[in-house]
């Protein structure tokens, strides 16, 4: 009986340690994984080069493509911009969800070509597919 109790105690300790060391997803990553196209009211894309600014609304098909790309992001795609380092973006997208607006804009920082704000934090996003998509719909030419 004592050996069975010791075995149970050992198993509980191992499981507890495993749970403590488990990597928790960043809040923003959970948000991007849970996002659905039907949650989004509109997606506006904009760019500003020189003195000309353009603003257009994405089609349902392009919105679905954007959501698919956002759903694929991983924790490694995000780096917290805790010092609020950045510049003035020249292009980006704005998602309207339940009356709130979420921007994904150009970034000039090495940790990511895009940046966003979520959960009172600024985040750099490093994902080539998403960056290419945003540049494409914003009609950015390098």
What are the functions of these language-model segments?
Residues 1-18:
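Sec-dependent bacterial lipoprotein signal peptides
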Residues 20-142:
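Function-determining sites in protein domains
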């Amino acid at each position: 009986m004592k050996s069975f109790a010791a075995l149970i105690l050992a198993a509980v300790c191992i499981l507890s340690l495993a749970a403590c060391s488990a990597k928790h997803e960043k809040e923003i990553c959970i948000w991007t994984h849970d996002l659905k196209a039907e949650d989004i009211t509109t997606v506006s894309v904009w760019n500003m080069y020189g003195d000309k600014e353009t603003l257009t609304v994405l089609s349902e098909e392009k919105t679905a493509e954007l959501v698919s790309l956002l759903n694929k992001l991983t924790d490694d795609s995000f780096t917290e911009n805790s010092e609020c380092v950045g510049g003035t973006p020249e292009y980006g997208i704005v998602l309207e969800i339940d009356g709130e607006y979420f921007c994904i804009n150009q970034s000039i920082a090495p940790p990511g070509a895009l940046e966003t704000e979520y959960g009172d934090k600024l985040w750099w996003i490093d994902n080539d597919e998403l960056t290419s998509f945003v540049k494409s719909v914003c009609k950015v030419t390098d």
